[in-house]
Amino acid sequence: MSGFPTQDFVALVPVAILTMGALVLLMTEVFLTSGRRAYQAYLTMVFAAAAAGYAAWMPVPGNVFGRQAVVDSFSAFVTVVLCAGLALSALVGQSWLNARNSERGEFYALALFGTAGMVLLGMATDLLIAFIAVEVMSLSTYCLAAFLRRGKKPAEAAFKYVVLGSISSALLLYGSALLYGASGSTLFSVLPRGQGSALYLAGIALVAGGVAFKIAAVPFHAWTPDVYEGAPTPVTAFMAAGVKTAAFAVLVRLFLATESGSAAMSTSLGTVLSALAVLTMIFGNLLALPQRSVKRMLAYSSIGHAGYLLVGVVSAVVAGARDKALAGLLFYLAAYTATVIGAFAVVGALERRTRGDFEPADAWDLDRFAGLARRRPALAFAMAVFLFSLAGVPPTAGFIGKFYIFKAAMGAGLYGLAVLGVLTSVLGAYYYLRVVLYMYFLPSKDEAGEVVLSAPSLTIALAAAVAVVVLLGVVADPMVRLAQAASAIIL
């Protein structure tokens, strides 16, 4: 402890705030009655805001803990996005869990612990720190996936997530060991020393596979639809936004360091990443097309969005358009966080209640959305905004994000990836706009037993998400400038 200067520990204040918040919630849980547990969601928001505020106005950036982690504009931007996603997820979770009499402090504590791991992952510049952060994030999301112990789906989702996630962790750890053997260090910046050896190639492939699992890139995507569908809907929203943001942050840092070696290695890395992007965009959108479950459709579409983000990574890491591509990627992550959490919030609000309990068997079917504009016009409007953003329809945040990523790809000479991204976006628009068609142009089906959540916390979450999606689409310049500043100072 005495070997590190005080500023190293000061850099971890956002992580400490989130961790302390989790401990506070666990301790206060003992003294709260069921009627007062709603305050825990708002307390979670306070800790998230404190961590985000400190990250945004943090003192002088730099490498900390012997260059094992870094505080820079990139990590600050990622931290703010992650904390904003946590706050929205807490609001959505409060209404969803309260309706099921399942609201408990450990839900918010686990979300805070998970976000602490995500924030640390965004700062990591060392394989061991990255692995620790991944495990903190993963263990929290494993528990959250099984939080609602009713029926087989949550248990099945959590079991699949744990088993496949353990394989992912094994790939990451074994790959780290091989990279250490090849380069003599676990620091990202030192890894290129081992380039050219078989150990290095095997290690970087295994580490990339472990991270690809977290972002749900093809062919590491198989867990996504079952886990997203079986997990509690607020947890699905939290995972879809937070895990993807943190994983892409560490992926960018790792590959920016890795490509600094030989030109041959950079070319090989670009080929592999491009192949992953192509497969992920194509299969993510194709598999989403036939889905009648809106929740499962959103799960498959998240795979497609990982493909678009990979285009940004390829442009930044390999093709030399670093600043523009990173700015587009950061903007996209911010827009996607608000959009996907909002979309899952609407899906959760429509889950059917039968025989006194919520029955998810048909809760997410397209027929549940038929005529929603007449029954719940505000809810239908919010869902339409989120779907337009996911489809990349102007003037929404999703359109601006895709525009900047594909523009960076074109500027870097990656015309094939850019054109494929546009084509798969058009394909994705079909299944997104199909839901809008059901909501606005088809008559309602049997509404017997329907219960639509309308808690104040859900209303706040949806209003905030809609505002972000619309404002980032109409007045994008301030956020674009912030993303450009964050991408320009990545240490």
UniProtKB/Swiss-Prot annotation:
GO biological process, one term: ATP synthesis coupled electron transport
Alphabetized InterPro entries for the sequence: NADH-Q_OxRdtase_suN/2 (IPR010096), ND/Mrp_TM (IPR001750)
Major enzyme class: translocase
Signal peptide region: none
Membrane topology summary: Multi-pass membrane protein
Assigned GO CC terms: plasma membrane
UniProt-annotated location(s): Cell inner membrane
The protein's name: NADH-quinone oxidoreductase subunit N
Organism per entry: Anaeromyxobacter dehalogenans (strain 2CP-1 / ATCC BAA-258)
